[in-house]
Amino acid sequence: MDPCECSKTGSCNCGGSCKCSNCACTSCKKSCCSCCPSGCSKCASGCICKGKTCDTSCCQ
């Protein structure tokens, strides 16, 4: 899957699995958005990004 191009457009939608706003990923699957930190690799399906950190709200 191609990564989001938020740096170019300021917004994106990667195949429905990623939503970005103001060059920031607001929700994504780890295969799409770089904002999901490496710790989120344990998530089986998707990852909810809260800033730049992986906390208890990271994995859904």
From Swiss-Prot:
Q: Which residues are noted in the entry as a divalent metal cation 3-binding?
A: 14, 18, 23, 28
Quote the function comment for this protein: Metallothioneins have a high content of cysteine residues that bind various heavy metals.
Per UniProt, where does a divalent metal cation 2 bind?
6, 12, 14, 25
The molecule here is called Metallothionein
GO: which molecular function terms?
metal ion binding
**Which gene codes for it?**
mt
Please give the record's comment on domains. Class I metallothioneins contain 2 metal-binding domains: four divalent ions are chelated within cluster A of the alpha domain and are coordinated via cysteinyl thiolate bridges to 11 cysteine ligands. Cluster B, the corresponding region within the beta domain, can ligate three divalent ions to 9 cysteines.
Residues annotated for a divalent metal cation 1 binding in this entry: 4, 6, 20, 23
InterPro entries with a match to the protein in the record: Metalthion_dom_sf, Metalthion_dom_sf_vert, Metalthion_vert, Metalthion_vert_metal_BS
Q: Does the keyword Metal-binding apply?
A: yes
Q: Which residues does the record give as a divalent metal cation 7 binding sites?
A: 49, 54, 58-59
Provide the residue positions that the database annotates as binding a divalent metal cation 6.
36, 40, 43, 59
Source organism of this protein record: Esox lucius
Tell me its family: Belongs to the metallothionein superfamily. Type 1 family.
Per the record, the domain of life is Eukaryota
Gene Ontology biological-process entries: angiogenesis; positive regulation of cell migration involved in sprouting angiogenesis; positive regulation of vascular endothelial growth factor production; response to cadmium ion; response to copper ion; response to methylmercury; response to zinc ion
From the UniProt entry, list the residue stretches annotated as the region Beta: 1-28
Entry keyword set = Metal-binding, Metal-thiolate cluster
Which residues bind a divalent metal cation 4 per the record? 32-33, 43, 47
The residues listed in the UniProt record as binding a divalent metal cation 5, with positions renumbered to this chain, are 33, 35-36, 49
Key word ATP-binding present:
no
